[in-house]
Amino acid sequence: MSSQAFTSVHPNAATSDVNVTIDTFVAKLKRRQVQGSYAIALETLQLLMRFISAARWNHVNDLIEQIRDLGNSLEKAHPTAFSCGNVIRRILAVLRDEVEEDTMSTTVTSTSVAEPLISSMFNLLQKPEQPHQNRKNSSGSSSMKTKTDYRQVAIQGIKDLIDEIKNIDEGIQQIAIDLIHDHEILLTPTPDSKTVLKFLITARERSNRTFTVLVTEGFPNNTKNAHEFAKKLAQHNIETLVVPDSAVFALMSRVGKVIIGTKAVFVNGGTISSNSGVSSVCECAREFRTPVFAVAGLYKLSPLYPFDVEKFVEFGGSQRILPRMDPRKRLDTVNQITDYVPPENIDIYITNVGGFNPSFIYRIAWDNYKQIDVHLDKNKA
């Protein structure tokens, strides 16, 4: 999306430098040059901070619409980068809460001024004072400080969210000590998840417990990540085995827990994993009554509902599965990169604020988002 296209919507939205930054980030999202929910969320917040600092508006609703337009542009650039839209919705919720709080306080103040208490019979004979002049002066001073106040509220909300994301692993790692037992066999089908990696390392170092981790190779897209994941665990004296995807069913009877990483968590309790084949592993665990724990930070919680699952699942090139062939040979090859896991195949979500059942995820989502901001696109809202 060009800077001219974005500026035409709001010509005074930001300076040219910010528009160039927006175009650069949009291009990086389209080319998939930014990988991982963590990196995308932090870069989006840094961009949003620059955007709000340079934004111009007459009313706070104008600022909210500008932020929504920016979020819509980023979501269209990378529709499956859910953390990008999630953090923008979090800041919108902060602004809307502040607007609602200011509106309520203004209403209470005007009511108390307009309707003074009559304390004695003598006051009944007096002409009440007209507070219109005072209200005019107060509203004038309020309008003068509105821009500065809401700008600071949004920037402070962004800083708080950045701190939350950077320290999100600490809250999750505290649960690892109580969750993993000694001499237990664990299985993880998401070797590219840094949160799962820190989760297992923390359980080994802080509790000094001995356990074995089985890592599925994730052929064909994550085989290299699986071996690197196993190598990092072995460096912390954790016994690790890389197993073929086809051996999961045979090994599941020995597994005590399945731990998966997430890319996005929807309000129905379902999740998008960053590796294909995770859904089959969770389905197998359900048949063997093996508990499945999904590790996710709050910034991965999305207010969207997966009505069309195929729209949220990514597909890659077929060159990893089959070599290049004669185009005249009609053969359709599917290389699924991500996977959707339904809520019935997940037992507990482990977040930085505690563990929750999938059926309770919707309540946590609505504590952080507003219903009006579920769809940033005006045509869908």
Swiss-Prot record:
Annotated region Disordered: the residues are 125-148
Q: Name one Pfam family in it.
A: IF-2B
KW Protein biosynthesis (keyword) present: yes
What keywords sit in the KW lines? Answer: Cytoplasm, Initiation factor, Protein biosynthesis, Translation regulation
Q: Where in the cell is it found?
A: Cytoplasm, Cytosol
Q: What else is known?
A: Present with 6650 molecules/cell in log phase SD medium.
The task this protein performs is described as:
Acts as a component of the translation initiation factor 2B (eIF2B) complex, which catalyzes the exchange of GDP for GTP on the eukaryotic initiation factor 2 (eIF2) complex gamma subunit. Its guanine nucleotide exchange factor activity is repressed when bound to eIF2 complex phosphorylated on the alpha subunit, thereby limiting the amount of methionyl-initiator methionine tRNA available to the ribosome and consequently global translation is repressed.
Q: What is this protein called?
A: Translation initiation factor eIF2B subunit beta
Naturally occurring in which organism (per UniProt): Saccharomyces cerevisiae (strain ATCC 204508 / S288c)
